[in-house]
Design a protein with these regions (language model features):
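FAD-binding core/adjacent interface of flavoenzyme oxidoreductases
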Residues: 1-7, 19-26, 35-45, 52, ...
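Contiguous mid-protein beta-loop-alpha structural module that forms a pocket-lining wall or clamp
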Residues: 259-302
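Flexible, glycine-rich terminal cap/loop adjacent to redox cofactors
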Residues: 7-12, 16-18, 22-33, 45, ...
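Short glycine/serine/threonine-rich phosphate/pyrophosphate-binding segments
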Residues: 12-16, 184-187, 266
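Generic enzyme active-site microenvironment
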Residues: 29, 200, 278
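Conserved N-terminal glycine-rich FAD pyrophosphate-binding loop of Rossmann-like flavoproteins
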Residues: 33-55, 206-219
Length: 418
């Protein structure tokens, strides 16, 4: 019998399996597709690589002359870029597999289900075989939310509509993006710089979800300056072959429709009591750092360690160009608990390095404080915002940096992990 069976090999599942095995627990990890989950294979990492390419292209186009660089004649080579993306993902996947195997985690490439409760454990079925484990950890991850819009199923089947998982390997002449959250904004940024005519349709009043309104304005201005068309407070009630209808009856045509309407749990949680559920599968906060924190808490409980664990303050970022990042409360949220709460706004140009490296930007940071002066929230806009966000203490707690960021390395080094 295994001590721990982890179902799902995304950030939370891999974190739980590796930590359990390093603590001496006999551990098996089930993953039906590729290790790393959506984040590594289709989401966070490959999208950041595409954005890095877009950032370099735009820097050559707009900033190079200001630094005395004559950069005429550069062009996109999308075949090379896509190969680079696939190689990078494969390399990271292989490194993840090696780390898990080095920790003595048994890997099973199969879908798995918790079948029944046994005396002292659980029965798990995977690939026609049965496994017994003292404690399962359900980390089956999430999947893109597909809204119930007439015509969307047919559009997906025909290849007109895609999710970030099926990004076209060629840049489409025109792209309609349904959803103005992080993925929608990031991919709108890349495809517009790559040459697509891009339109975003967002049901909310602003882009970016629950962002400070100034960050939403910052993102909107950057996109519109590049020529991205944005329809907020709008919906698409019907989709056809090469078109989508807005709520007012007007039609938008496009070569591709990209669906970025949020996230949901990929599978139903097992009914058996006693199964620990972590990460996106729990349907609480769809963030990789949250999944990893919940994985650590789950393994602590298995090992009989019950430290005082409060929900972490997790920074989240939208890696547009320039990027924005946020952690903690907005001023409105702070004033619900402290009427004397206040805020301060400072320009990022107070940093000499920022001013030297980003002459075309006008970034800023906003701090939200309690009446007693304690920092309750930070909201940052400009290059480097994601790395800055993980450097604060909010309400007496260290902020977990956004994913993916270099700041995450601090935690690994402090924990002595390989």
């Amino acid at each position: 019998m295994y001590d721990v069976a982890v179902i799902g090999g995304g950030p939370g599942g891999c974190r739980a399996a590796g930590l359990a095995a390093r603590r001496g627990l006999k551990t098996v990890l089930f993953e039906r597709e590729e290790l790393g989950g959506v984040c590594l294979n289709y989401g966070c990492i490959p999208i950041k690589l595409l954005l890095h390419a877009a950032r370099m292209y735009e820097a050559l186009e707009l900033e190079a002359p200001q630094f005395g660089i004559d950069a005429e004649g550069f062009r996109w080579d999308f075949e090379t870029l896509w190969k680079r993306k696939e190689r990078t993902v494969a390399r990271l996947r292989a490194a993840l597999r090696q780390r898990l195997q080095a920790a003595a985690v048994e890997l099973v490439n199969s879908e798995a289900a918790v079948e029944s409760k046994l005396p002292g454990g659980f029965c798990i079925e995977a690939g026609g075989c049965r496994y017994e484990a003292r404690q399962p950890i359900w980390a089956a991850g999430g999947k893109p939310h597909i809204p119930a819009i007439p015509g969307i199923a047919e559009a997906l089947a025909a290849g007109f509509a895609v999710t970030p998982r099926e990004l076209p390997a060629a840049v489409p002449p025109s792209l309609l993006i349904l959803g103005g959250g992080a993925a929608g904004i990031e991919l709108a940024t890349f495809f517009r710089i790559a040459g697509s005519a891009v339109t975003i349709v967002e049901a909310g009043n602003t882009l970016g979800g629950r962002l400070d309104f100034r960050l939403a304005q910052f993102l909107t201005a950057a996109l519109e300056k590049r020529g991205v068309k944005i329809h907020t407070a709008n919906t698409i009630p019907r989709i056809g072959d090469g078109w989508a209808e807005l709520a007012d009856g007007s039609r938008l045509t496009a070569s591709k429709l990209l669906i970025t309407c949020g996230w949901e749990a990929a599978a139903a949680v097992p009914a058996s009591p006693g199964v620990q559920v972590i990460g996106d599968a729990a349907g609480r906060r769809f963030l990789a750092p949250v999944a990893e924190w919940e994985a650590e808490a789950a393994v602590d409980r298995l090992c009989g360690i019950s430290p005082e664990r409060t929900q972490p303050v997790v920074a989240r970022a939208i890696f547009a160009i320039p990027e924005v990042a946020t952690a903690g409360m907005t001023l409105d949220e702070a004033r619900q608990m402290d009427a004397a709460a206040y805020e301060r706004r400072l320009p990022l140009t107070l940093s000499g390095r920022y001013m030297a490296e980003h002459p075309l930007e006008n970034g800023f940071g906003v701090g939200v404080y309690s009446g007693a002066g304690e920092l309750l929230g930070v909201h940052l806009a400009g290059s480097g915002a994601a790395e800055l966000a993980g450097s604060f203490q909010i309400n007496g707690r260290a902020v977990m940096p956004p994913h993916p960021s270099l700041s995450e390395f601090n935690r690994l080094l402090q924990a002595g992990e390989s």
